Amino acid sequence: MTTNTVSRKVAWLRVVTLAVAAFIFNTTEFVPVGLLSDIAQSFHMQTAQVGIMLTIYAWVVALMSLPFMLMTSQVERRKLLICLFVVFIASHVLSFLSWSFTVLVISRIGVAFAHAIFWSITASLAIRMAPAGKRAQALSLIATGTALAMVLGLPLGRIVGQYFGWRMTFFAIGIGALITLLCLIKLLPLLPSEHSGSLKSLPLLFRRPALMSIYLLTVVVVTAHYTAYSYIEPFVQNIAGFSANFATALLLLLGGAGIIGSVIFGKLGNQYASALVSTAIALLLVCLALLLPAANSEIHLGVLSIFWGIAMMIIGLGMQVKVLALAPDATDVAMALFSGIFNIGIGAGALVGNQVSLHLSMSMIGYVGTVPAFAALIWSIIIFRRWPVTLEEQTQ
């Protein structure tokens, strides 16, 4: 059975299963944001000290995305997915059993290894397995899985951690991954590597200034976002003085707003992708600047989180669409680079938030985040004027 002869129903089932996998991988990456206080309490540490776990995870992904992708470039994709899921599940069992913070960090590094490979191949696999003429919808489903990780995954993970302990959150993610793995084994055909690219692809990609500019924009804007977002849970409780339940609700609201951003991008992205991304970066800048002033009211923080969530979803979708459009001949290499660069931004933002919290005040995370956000806004305006046609290739 090949991907060309299967029924549309089976083809969609494969894409949906990949979207569920995307949901699980994004949930485990983001869920520590909602568990920092609980993990810190468990190991008798400061919240800011535990936060370094976010940076380690993100930078391992950043460092290993391209090497792992190149090492596995000729490996049949079904076998590769099964292997990385086994590593992913085993690492979550270790997270559940963690008897020290060091062991927890080691388990997260194992998850990061699996993550590094998964995100470099997922978009291209979704396109390959989609029914004829439905590639855009397949990518949209993967993006929906990503969005739902913010909408449901992170808040549910926090709720489980709140009532059953943070270890159970990681255990539940491992169980979800096991079920998904069984579905993948049943549904996926043999998937020989295609358009994976190689080291020979790198000089070609590096000679594309529009693509390199998108990568730079990605790392700067993601740094801005994660400077504040990494510590939003302790910020809400310790700086704003609101309850743990409100922190959970706020994470749910911020994630849910991402669905609105996805709908907006779906309707307007084909014609106005560049303008949407620049507008979203400007909106992120405003949200970060108003984070501390909004902390005096639950309503103000709630409204701010809605706009924040919308902005980040539009930015994330816009960056991914442009990368895929600018490197159709080496999608796996381009997406491995994108995943690595995105995670450099996550790690940098979490580290900046960590240092601000330790040496200045956690109340300052929003203000500090405005610096890279402003730089990203200026850069986006420059590059979208410099390469207006190239960056809109995906609309043709």
Curated annotation (Swiss-Prot):
CDD domains: MFS_NepI_like. GO terms for molecular function: carbohydrate transmembrane transporter activity. It comes from Escherichia coli O157:H7 (strain EC4115 / EHEC). It is a multi-pass membrane protein. Keywords: Cell inner membrane, Cell membrane, Membrane, Sugar transport, Transmembrane, Transmembrane helix, Transport. It is found in: Cell inner membrane. This is Probable sugar efflux transporter. Belongs to the major facilitator superfamily. SotB (TC 2.A.1.2) family. PANTHER family: PURINE EFFLUX PUMP PBUE, SUGAR EFFLUX TRANSPORTER. GO terms for cellular component: plasma membrane. It comes from the Bacteria. The keyword Transmembrane helix applies. Involved in the efflux of sugars. The physiological role may be the reduction of the intracellular concentration of toxic sugars or sugar metabolites. The chain crosses the membrane at residues 15-35, 50-70, 81-101, 103-123, 136-156, 170-190, 209-229, 246-266, 275-295, 299-319, 333-353, 364-384.
